[in-house]
């Protein structure tokens, strides 16, 4: 009877010793071990990655919270304004600070401390080793001079263009159909330009904008190509090839000033102005944060000064608004304005590394295509609606001529 009970129990769930040995032998076969090993490894790798991501996220968010809510307000303001410079990170400060606090920090950054100096005194103080010498343009290539610059927190690039009539606004489309903007490599082909920098502002929610339309009034070759009536800083050239930087600008005023080419950027980006024999530097009275920057200026002799700085890297954190003004002063600009920055900051110069004897092996993939600055975004250079382009020296269809014909 006991034996019968044992047999019954075995069939109801108990495994005999012989059966256990068979099962163990099956599990120890090479194929079974391989399947178990691969599954275990994949699971552990996945678990480790999730854990690492969570740890890094918590650490970063905690550090950001402490920094933004700590006792050091200058550091807080710098971090907030640096994040606000790029559309892709504008939402970050709102995670840790009240909206009115963020708005107040941004508003404070627009407070201007003007420095007024006579034009003669300014010209004497701003001359550097190159400017003002008779042979400055002796070794110029394409009627331009490319130079590297650096500051305490940034590396940058200066492109001097001797003839201001060659500088014009290139547009990605006629802005009537909402087409995506163009990358800088495409705009120079479309406009047959030898050089270019990014231009004005455009809608960029969350850093995902397509660059389809500009923001603020925009002129190209003597014609108003966009006018949404938004009040912005205006940066452009009149038909006498003089740089005009002012805010705000409307179509009626632009036409009365004979504007031929120009774009708009956020309010508060007038850098240097000159009138009545004086030059005024519009320094920021408070912290403006560091970022990639693009700006355009002009000397009294008409020379146009393009500036682009690198940013968001260990070797170049970025430049402040005041840094950009100081560079402009060094190069003798009597008028200057800031253009769109962050991941939009771009400078192109056709075959510059060949013309200036730069080792091509030191360049990244975009620089080998003609990009002068180092692009730090995670994608290809952005699609943008407007650019300041430089016509080729030998072209007869100059920007000034195009403006006169319009």
Language model feature labels by segment:
Residues 202-285:
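Active-site-adjacent helix-turn-beta-strand microarchitecture at beta-sheet edges
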Residues 161-165, 236-242, 274-276, 298-303, ...:
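Short acidic-glycine loop/turn motifs at beta-strand connectors
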Residues 194-198, 234-236, 244, 295-297, ...:
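Structural recognition of the beta-strand scaffold that forms the well-ordered cores
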Residues 178-182, 254-260, 315-322:
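A short, polar/proline- and glycine-enriched secondary-structure boundary/capping micro-motif
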Residues 3-4, 8, 12-227:
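Zymogen propeptides
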Residues 154-156, 190-192, 230-232, 291-293, ...:
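Extracytoplasmic
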Residues 208-229, 280-334, 344-406:
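Conserved, well-ordered active-site substructure
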Residues 173-177, 250-253, 309-313:
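Short, solvent-exposed aromatic-acidic interface loops
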């Amino acid at each position: 009877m006991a034996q019968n009970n044992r047999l019954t129990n075995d069939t109801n769930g108990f495994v005999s010793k012989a059966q256990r040995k068979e099962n163990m032998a099956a599990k120890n076969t090479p194929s079974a071990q391989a399947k178990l090993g691969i599954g275990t490894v994949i699971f552990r790798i996945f678990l480790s990655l999730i854990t690492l991501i969570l740890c890094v996220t918590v650490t970063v968010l905690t550090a950001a919270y402490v920094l933004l809510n700590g006792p050091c307000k200058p550091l807080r303001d710098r971090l907030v304004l640096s994040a606000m410079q790029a559309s892709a990170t504008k939402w970050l400060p709102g995670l840790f600070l009240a909206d009115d606090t963020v708005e107040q920090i941004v508003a404070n950054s627009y407070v201007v401390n003007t420095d007024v100096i006579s034009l003669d005194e300014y010209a004497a103080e701003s001359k550097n080793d190159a400017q003002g010498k008779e042979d400055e343009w002796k070794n110029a290539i394409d009627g331009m001079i490319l130079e590297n610059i650096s500051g305490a927190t940034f590396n940058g690039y200066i492109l001097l263009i001797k003839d201001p009539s060659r500088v014009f606004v290139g547009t990605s489309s006629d802005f009537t159909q909402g087409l995506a903007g163009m990358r800088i490599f495409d705009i120079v082909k479309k406009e047959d330009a030898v050089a270019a920098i990014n231009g004005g502002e455009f809608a960029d929610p969350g850093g995902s904008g397509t660059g389809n339309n500009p923001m603020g009034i925009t002129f190209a070759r003597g014609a108003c190509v966009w006018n949404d009536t938004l009040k912005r800083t205006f940066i452009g050239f009149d038909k006498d090839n003089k740089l005009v930087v002012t805010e705000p600008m409307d179509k009626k005023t632009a036409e009365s000033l004979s504007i031929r080419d120009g774009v708009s950027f956020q309010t508060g980006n007038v850098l240097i102005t000159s009138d009545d024999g004086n030059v005024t530097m519009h320094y920021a009275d408070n912290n403006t944060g560091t970022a990639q920057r693009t700006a355009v200026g002009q000397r009294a002799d008409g020379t146009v000064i393009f500036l682009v700085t690198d940013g968001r890297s260990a070797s170049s954190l970025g430049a402040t608004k005041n840094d950009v003004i100081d560079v402009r002063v060094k190069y003798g600009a009597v008028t200057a304005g800031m253009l769109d920055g962050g991941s939009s900051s771009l400078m192109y110069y056709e075959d510059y590394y060949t013309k200036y004897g730069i080792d091509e092996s030191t360049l990244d993939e975009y620089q080998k295509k003609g990009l002068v600055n180092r692009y730090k975004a995670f994608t290809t250079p952005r699609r943008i609606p407007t650019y300041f382009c430089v016509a080729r020296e030998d072209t007869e269809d100059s920007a000034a001529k195009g403006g006169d014909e319009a």
